[in-house]
C-alpha cells in the first residue's frame, strides 16, 4: 500500500471511529483537542488501526500519538510489510 492510499485509509478509520467529517481531519489535527476523542475513543481508534494495518501498537507508543500526522508517521514506519 502506498503512502497516499494509507493516509486515505487512516482518515476513513478516524472519521468512522470518531464520527467526524473527513474535512476536519488534517495532519495537524490533535485527536483529542481538535477531533473530540475521549480516552475510550482513543483506545478504540488504536484497536481499529491495529486491525486495519495488521500492526500492534504498544500502550507506550499509543500514548505518544497526539496528531493525525503522528498516526501517519507511526504506521508508515511500523506497519506490516
From Swiss-Prot:
PROSITE patterns: CARRIER, PHOSPHOPANTETHEINE. Keywords: Cytoplasm, Fatty acid biosynthesis, Fatty acid metabolism, Lipid biosynthesis, Lipid metabolism, Phosphopantetheine, Phosphoprotein. Coiled coil: none annotated. Its main location: cytoplasm. GO terms for cellular component: cytosol; membrane. Residues 1-79 form the Carrier domain. The modification O-(pantetheine 4'-phosphoryl)serine is found at residue 39. It holds the Pfam family PP-binding. Belongs to the acyl carrier protein (ACP) family. This is Acyl carrier protein. It comes from Syntrophobacter fumaroxidans (strain DSM 10017 / MPOB).
Amino acid at each position: 500500500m502506498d503512502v497516499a492510499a494509507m493516509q486515505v485509509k487512516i482518515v476513513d478509520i478516524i472519521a468512522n471511529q470518531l464520527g467526524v467529517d473527513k474535512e476536519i481531519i488534517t495532519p495537524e489535527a490533535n485527536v483529542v483537542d481538535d477531533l473530540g476523542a475521549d480516552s475510550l475513543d482513543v483506545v478504540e481508534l488504536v484497536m481499529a488501526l491495529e486491525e486495519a494495518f495488521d500492526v500492534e501498537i504498544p500502550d507506550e507508543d499509543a500514548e505518544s500519538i497526539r496528531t493525525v500526522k503522528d498516526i501517519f508517521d507511526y504506521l508508515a514506519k511500523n506497519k506490516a510489510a
